Amino acid sequence: MPTSDSGEPRRIAMKPNGVTVPISDQQEQLPCPRCDSSNTKFCYYNNYNFSQPRHFCKACRRYWTHGGTLRDVPVGGGTRKSAKRSRTCSNSSSSSVSGVVSNSNGVPLQTTPVLFPQSSISNGVTHTVTESDGKGSALSLCGSFTSTLLNHNAAATATHGSGSVIGIGGFGIGLGSGFDDVSFGLGRAMWPFSTVGTATTTNVGSNGGHHAVPMPATWQFEGLESNAGGGFVSGEYFAWPDLSITTPGNSLK
């Protein structure tokens, strides 16, 4: 190993091309320019440039280039472990914020009432909301729905001669007449056909006239030509009793 004039051994630095260069004094332990600590070490040369030796301070865990400009990095920055701690703290803070949002100062969120207009239009029939449907314009859902069904059914009965919606009052929720004639408490169905009639309504014949169609007992029809027992009505329609459903008689031939 080559020695210096003073007799001390000298370390040799190897270039990438194989040329040996003696290590200068810049590779020795230099004080840290940030914290003035002597616990430093030489790391490498920037881009293999011997004029830019790179050093590392073990005290403040920062790199610097001897003779270069120090970056504006705060002294005493955190390591990876501290970064993990900060990430955990951020998660806990976000969870606490979400808890505050879900429970705003311990006061439960109040439900917003559903507002309906004072009048609603359905199939050309105007229904005016009264005080019995609800308090003010904030109506209870059950009351407004019930009144809408009842008024719509009554208006359709006055327009077409029979109900144009299916009555579901037999379900026990107070929505008017239902399927009670089906013998299990559901009431008579009312289908949206203009030529359909109940036991006391009228049907439109082929000549444009009106005639009464009596309805027999549930699910019973007697002769094909009997108007009283169901079957063919005036030779043109086949009626299912108590369901007020008519189909062309020619379809059964």
From Swiss-Prot:
Zinc finger (Dof-type): 30-84
Keywords tagged on the record: DNA-binding, Metal-binding, Nucleus, Transcription, Transcription regulation, Zinc, Zinc-finger
GO biological process, one term: response to auxin
Subunit structure, interactors included: Interacts with OBF4 or OBF5.
Stated role: Transcription factor that binds specifically to a 5'-AA[AG]G-3' consensus core sequence. Enhances the DNA binding of OBF transcription factors to OCS elements.
InterPro entries in the cross-refs: Dof (IPR045174), Znf_Dof (IPR003851)
UniProt key word Zinc-finger: yes
Positions of the UniProt region annotated as Disordered: 73-103
GO molecular function: DNA binding; DNA-binding transcription factor activity; transcription cis-regulatory region binding; zinc ion binding
GO cellular component: nucleus
Protein induction: By auxin and salicylic acid (SA).
Localization in the cell: Nucleus
Protein name in UniProt: Dof zinc finger protein DOF3.4
Residue numbers binding Zn(2+): 32, 35, 57, 60
Species lineage: Eukaryota, Viridiplantae, Streptophyta, Embryophyta, Tracheophyta
Any Pfam family hit: Zn_ribbon_Dof
Disulfide bridges in this chain: none
